[in-house]
């Protein structure tokens, strides 16, 4: 096929501009990204060769080679991995996957460190070569294709690129960077080695360079015809913990998670017994951009006897721990394991149980830290992944108690929206006569904090948890108690805050009896809007509030389901009125404006709990009429 010149996808042009102009001060990341791509190409070859050993083409020793030519001012990264066909070269080097494009650009902050971190995360690392090169030449051939189907891809990083078919004997990919003026420091063995050891020491593939020795006569380093490996070239997780430094763990995390930030915590151990495997797990310090996408692929990298099998093996972790990154290397699974086999395998179930327990132990260590730095780390973790972890209450029955201990909530104990109250903290502060853990759900912290349902709790000094995450109502349908104490909504059913003395009981009964004509007339007036109307003593400042019956769906959950486009049963609340409030005291069952007052008390209560009025115009008209009659 003859040479073709093609235009870059518009987003790639934008990306190239960013690479060249915005990330210059962090330019050495280009080598990290290109080495990482070469390592992935080797992993893919190993995986495909499990089915077809001929793909090795008599060259089974996988490696990455770095070389440079001072005269030509070029730097070359060469691998003997899977390689690319012509179509793959056009697809991989000319476009960015559409799904990630918009998110990538929306995440760019202008902070060079943070923006550099996004490059690997979004799979656009190849283009980082243009930070230091004004032209890139890629020669490649896919394993299994004939030598006549080699490909040359070339671009100056402007608007287009050319693709040509060439003869290429060796499989794999050779990337040649034609360096920009001022980048001569990269034409140095010492400089390249230092970048490799900084970013890519953990890569399990040997990274080779020609040895150099000092030539006394020439007074300079001279290249020898002998290779040396410039990285450790062993799978980091196979080493003893004592042989791995903190810095090496951090670098490995950045490689495996495509993240430029350090992890919050990690755990590394070998498990022997029913199943034998090594696990190296990390807790990231921030959530990936697509964590909530329906097609988000969480999971760990799976290896069998150090052979890479798959990325994102989600069967090794429950969904609520999908943010955990890392590696599992099994000694028992077959090398030809597929995603289907993973679903059925007894060994995988044992690994999943073990990995889940280990991940929860890691989170427990973070949560129980006594020092300020440790506490700060758990706060960081909770703000990034707290809502995901809450899913575990419903998804993981076996570990529900452990997950519940890790949960954090805002509460009336503090005057901030910080979610830093553990259920154990709440229980420790409970009043001697208190038997339940009380909570309120709302759309926002402000709405929860100012809910009329909290008035009597404030008066009696009883703490209430303020729940404002979308997942909370769903979670509460599984979390019925903690430490033997039932969880109770302040907006559901009858309220019991402890025994009343005889005088109080008698006074309340008399008030209820006196209000009966008003209550009955209100029920009749409001009709199908309410399930019931009753006198309450839970309010101190507000005239009315809405509560759900014990077995009914709350108004908050109904609104959430509707917002998600799901069918929700109609909400028929109970209207509770405060007999001590002046507005309620002034109600006359036979008054001409009784109907307007009834609807106003209902609408006010609905608004106070975050609901939406069915007919705002009537509400305004009714309110104006009542204000005018009072003013007159």
Curated annotation (Swiss-Prot):
Q: Which family does it belong to?
A: Belongs to the heat shock protein 90 family.
Segments carrying the region annotation (A) are 1-339
Q: Which GO terms fall under molecular function for this chain's record?
A: ATP binding; ATP hydrolysis activity; ATP-dependent protein folding chaperone; unfolded protein binding
Q: Which HAMAP family match?
A: HSP90 (MF_00505)
Q: Which GO terms describe its cellular component?
A: cytoplasm
Q: Which UniProt keywords apply?
A: ATP-binding, Chaperone, Cytoplasm, Nucleotide-binding, Stress response
Q: Which InterPro entries match?
A: HATPase_C_sf, Heat_shock_protein_90_CS, HSP90_C, Hsp90_fam, Hsp90_N, Ribosomal_Su5_D2-typ_SF
Per the record's keyword annotation, is Chaperone included, yes or no? yes
Q: Which cysteines are joined by disulfide bonds?
A: none
According to its UniProt entry, the function of this protein is described as: Molecular chaperone. Has ATPase activity.
- Subunit comment: Homodimer.
Gene3D superfamilies from the xrefs? Answer: 3.30.230.80, 3.40.50.11260, Heat shock protein 90, C-terminal domain, Histidine kinase-like ATPase, C-terminal domain
What is the name listed in the Swiss-Prot or TrEMBL entry for this protein?
Chaperone protein HtpG
Segments forming a coiled coil: none
Q: Where is this region: B?
A: 340-559
User: Where is this protein localized, as stated in its record?
Assistant: Cytoplasm
Does the entry feature the keyword Transport, yes or no?
no
